[in-house]
């Protein structure tokens, strides 16, 4: 857990000091006198406490600490980067890789405002949208982001206010009859081999190019010169670019749960 809590403390100091003032006599003459005046000074102190310090002050047990870390590391945050077209994308299929890939945008006006995980698909729906991309592509059926989002909430894979648990990816894809193979964060050649053979790879990205916290995307192919093609449910423009594999490997969320950060998907 990397976020910090800022605590504020304050105190008031009372002190006295002399000040000069002009005294006027009844006859109109004046003289400068001194008097003692009470003053007060406010002291404010700000201190950033680490999560460990906060949990210690609350009295967390070791088990509670581990559970808090688990919750933090096993949710997909919704801080995405890139463009966000809140319009009807229509029917989009990428045909520049080993297999045609159906593309859905979570910000598509047809469903971006639909409620999901205490938010909306447009804001928090990268997980269901990535599943919809992979499932529609590999099954040949029309499986939309709202359908996957409804399944996610009904089966406890949505975490309120934080998008989706990482377990959504393997569980939802298996629900649609697909085979899911978990791959670790250092499996570059395994990913290239999978993409070259027409498989898809869902990945949870960490802070960097695609997100400030966590974001699901789909790797959909590899070019002859080793560049990776993606389907980013939040950014159509990112989905049209070629990406360096080392960047993908470096920014994949290494703390991912449920066998991530990479899930190789095949029919």
Model-derived segments and spans:
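Extracytoplasmic/secreted cell-surface and envelope-processing proteins
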Residues: 160-169, 210-215, 238-240
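Active-site-adjacent substructure of cysteine-protease-like catalytic cores
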Residues: 179-229, 233-235, 249-250, 263-266
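Extracytoplasmic/secreted envelope proteins and their assembly/folding machinery
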Residues: 127-135, 145, 149, 166-173, ...
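Noncatalytic regulatory segments and standalone regulatory/sensor domains
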Residues: 53, 59, 66, 70-73, ...
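Sec/Tat-exported extracytoplasmic proteins
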Residues: 108, 130, 134-142, 152-156, ...
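Serine/threonine-rich low-complexity intrinsically disordered regions
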Residues: 2-48
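Mid-length scaffold segments of soluble, non-membrane domains
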Residues: 151-186
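Active-site-adjacent structural segments surrounding the nucleophilic cysteine of cysteine proteases
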Residues: 1-2, 26-28, 43-158
């Amino acid at each position: 857990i990397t976020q910090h809590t800022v605590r504020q403390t304050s105190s008031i100091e009372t002190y006295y000091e002399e000040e000069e003032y002009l005294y006027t006599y009844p006859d109109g003459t004046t003289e400068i006198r001194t008097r003692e005046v009470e003053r007060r000074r406010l002291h404010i102190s700000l201190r950033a406490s680490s999560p460990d310090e906060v949990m210690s002050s609350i009295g967390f047990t070791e088990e509670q600490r581990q559970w808090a870390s688990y919750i933090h590391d096993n949710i997909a945050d919704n801080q995405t980067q890139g463009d966000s077209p809140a319009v009807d994308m229509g029917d989009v299929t990428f045909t520049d890789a080993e297999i045609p890939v159906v593309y859905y945008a979570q910000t598509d006006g047809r469903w971006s405002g639909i409620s999901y995980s205490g938010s909306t698909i447009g804001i928090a729906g990268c997980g269901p949208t990535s599943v919809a991309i992979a499932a529609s592509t590999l099954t040949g059926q029309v499986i939309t982001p709202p359908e996957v989002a409804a399944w996610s909430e009904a089966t406890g894979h949505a975490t309120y206010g934080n998008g989706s648990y990482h377990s959504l990816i393997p569980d939802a894809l298996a629900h649609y009859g697909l085979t899911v193979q978990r791959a670790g964060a250092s499996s570059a050649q395994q990913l290239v081999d999978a993409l070259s053979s027409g498989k898809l790879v869902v990945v949870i990205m960490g802070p960097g190019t695609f997100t400030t916290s966590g974001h699901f995307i789909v790797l959909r192919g590899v070019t002859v010169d080793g560049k990776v093609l993606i389907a980013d449910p939040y950014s159509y423009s990112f989905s049209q670019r070629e990406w360096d594999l080392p960047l993908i490997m470096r920014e994949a969320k290494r703390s991912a749960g449920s066998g991530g950060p990479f899930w190789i998907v095949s029919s």
